[in-house]
């Protein structure tokens, strides 16, 4: 059997284990694969995901740091590292990872969104607003960026701007608009 066939077979086994919800067994296979092939990007990314989903974000962080050290060109690796660092409260590291992902792939809307969350957590609202604008430009029909943008506008003491966003959301995500109205007292609730 060729090396490529062996890799494909092993990845298939991992996917099969995951389909049946056997995450720990899948992680054990991934870790064995990494012993033999320590730079395998698929195994590093999958292992990090499994560590995170099994409740060990610190192990996920270590694996993702290894991934981006070995494969610095992977925007997805940097994005995932940013996400894990944010979940651990490592906001400077999270911000740096999201910025690196954006530098590699400026159209990676999730990285713009993740960066905005890191900036919001650091109370850097003006910068967060700019990143949310970029996120909503890339994903205009996703409510997440719009929701956060409205919250930032409220925190910036700009209720009229937040109401404009709520009105915009009513056009394609009325439940999210209603949620914002309840949370902020703006929009139809205030009228």
Tell where the protein language model's regions lie, with residue ranges:
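Structural signature of tandem alpha-helical TPR/SEL1-like repeats
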Residues: 19-32, 54-66, 87-100, 122-134, ...
